[in-house]
Regions:
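Short glycine-enriched, charge-decorated loop/helix-capping segments at active-site entrances
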Residues: 77-82
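Alpha-amylase-like alpha-glycosidases and glucanotransferases acting on alpha-linked glucans and related
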Residues: 1-75, 86-202
Length: 202
């Protein structure tokens, strides 16, 4: 389990006491109040497809897949961005198109840009919208540097895999502004400088 990508410095496995008094350790990528689902279990997968179908039948226009990169677990791997995760999104997209054409799947993955855009798939088979997590810290960087060149160059370089995909642009979220999405866009020294400035300003 030491290879698993950790988005937070909290225990990966959390002990829970079952109704019979026994203790079971459950996978908690983010915190003890967010237990991960085991999509490798047919029962879990069917239950989640039922949930998806419920929302589609109720007329949902958007289906947001939260922290989608962590959906599948294989011990000995980083347990993020695995091929099985992409296959699940493709399954959800196929179901959505069959049951409620026009409903949009949006993925939320607070990761570096190159990993984030992988959730578009080939532009036809995964998410139609992807949260643009690099935008908030790049805007923050531009404000702190009083220089928009990096932001502007990055924005002009963006490409979508098809006309059926787009970005979900935002400037902050309930999680704040993460700096991990800057990796691969800014030098590490610029990221560390931004961290120092933010710490100084409280």
């Amino acid at each position: 389990l030491s290879a698993v990508t950790r988005p937070r410095a909290l225990p990966l496995l959390t002990p829970f006491t079952l109704h019979d008094g026994s203790v079971r350790h459950l996978w908690t990528t983010f915190s003890e109040d967010q237990i991960d689902l085991n999509f490798a279990s047919p029962d879990v997968l069917i239950a989640m497809v039922d949930v998806l179908l419920h929302y589609l039948m109720e007329g949902a226009n958007y289906i947001r897949l939260d922290a989608v990169g962590f959906m599948w677990k294989i011990p000995g791997t980083h347990c993020i961005h695995l091929e099985q995760t992409h296959q699940l999104i493709q399954l959800f997209r196929a179901i959505t198109e069959a049951v409620a054409p026009g409903t949009v799947i949006i993925t939320e993955t607070n990761v570096p840009h190159k990993d984030n855009i992988s959730y578009f798939g080939n532009g036809e088979n995964e998410a139609q919208m992807v949260y643009q997590f690099s935008l908030p810290p790049l805007v923050l960087h531009a404000i702190h540097r009083q220089d928009v060149r990096t932001l502007s160059q990055w924005a002009s370089s963006l490409e979508l895999p098809s006309t059926k995909t787009t970005w979900f642009n935002f400037l902050a979220s309930h999680d704040g502004i993460g700096l991990n999405p800057l990796r691969g866009i800014l030098p590490e020294s610029d990221i560390l400088s931004l961290v120092e400035k933010l710490q100084q300003e409280g």
